[in-house]
């Protein structure tokens, strides 16, 4: 059966050159080298509306290029602004895909989504062409009931920009840090305060069920000695 599915996908690519095709994750069954070469993107997981999807997406940086990792941002009317921020930042870990009931949400939520999409446009080249330099999900001991902090960092192809993601599940308020020697904070998105002192980038998370933040850092120019 699987061999026939592979033949079918290959036939589609041959018959329709340039086709942008998503390979369904099928519970992760298709996260293998054969299927990853057949489509333009592979859905990262079936955890579309689960908060634990952020941990799954981070861990998949070990085996997939994020430019091929389609991540659903499923936006629902019952979600709080905190949950919407969390969902949008989760999707920014890979190739963002909006879903849910966007026609039924409040103007506040639509504003968060629009701002998130605009922010993603400014970082997508790092997602597409960069290199992941930090994967940290060690605090998370259960995907079904995650608790703790997860981090991800990815640098641009030229090494001049650094993208830092942080997610917190049900922890007291705390500061989450990233090594950032020689970098300054250029922008951030999320429901968390962010800063960078030239040595560390920091984001304050926690104190609520879900919180998340993403920061874009840029390397400072060293002054040339006369």
Predicted regions, residues:
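Catalytic cores of secreted or luminal carbohydrate-active enzymes
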Residues: 88-137
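Short, glycine-/Ser/Thr-/acidic-enriched flexible segments
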Residues: 28, 169-171, 190
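Solvent-exposed beta-hairpin/edge-strand motifs
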Residues: 179-191
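Carbohydrate-binding surface patches
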Residues: 140-182, 212-216
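C-terminal beta-strand-rich structural cap/linker in extracellular carbohydrate-active enzymes
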Residues: 196-226
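Conserved active-site loop/cleft motifs that coordinate metal ions or position small ligands
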Residues: 20-22, 163-166, 185-186
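Glycan-recognition surfaces
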Residues: 2-104
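Short, exposed beta-strand/loop patches in secreted or surface proteins that constitute
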Residues: 151-155, 192-198
């Amino acid at each position: 059966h699987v061999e026939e599915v592979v033949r079918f996908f290959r036939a589609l690519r041959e018959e329709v050159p340039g086709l942008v095709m998503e390979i369904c994750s099928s519970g992760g069954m298709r996260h293998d080298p054969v299927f990853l070469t057949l489509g333009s993107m592979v859905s990262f997981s079936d955890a579309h509306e689960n908060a634990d999807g952020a941990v799954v997406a981070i861990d998949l940086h070990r085996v997939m290029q994020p430019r091929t990792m389609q991540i659903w941002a499923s936006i629902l009317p019952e979600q709080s602004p905190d949950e919407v921020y969390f969902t949008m930042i989760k999707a920014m870990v890979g190739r963002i895909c909006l879903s849910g009931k966007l026609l039924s949400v409040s103007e506040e939520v639509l504003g968060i989504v629009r701002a998130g999409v605009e922010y993603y446009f400014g970082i997508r080249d790092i997602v597409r062409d960069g290199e992941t330099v930090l994967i940290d999900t060690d605090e998370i001991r259960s995907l079904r009931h995650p608790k703790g902090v997860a981090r991800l960092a990815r640098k641009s192809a030229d090494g001049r920009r650094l993208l830092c993601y942080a997610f917190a599940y049900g922890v007291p308020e705390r500061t989450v840090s990233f090594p950032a020697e020689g970098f300054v904070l250029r922008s951030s998105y999320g429901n968390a305060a962010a800063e960078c002192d030239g040595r560390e980038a920091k984001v304050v998370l926690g104190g609520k069920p879900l919180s998340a933040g993403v920061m874009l850092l840029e390397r400072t120019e060293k002054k040339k000695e006369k």
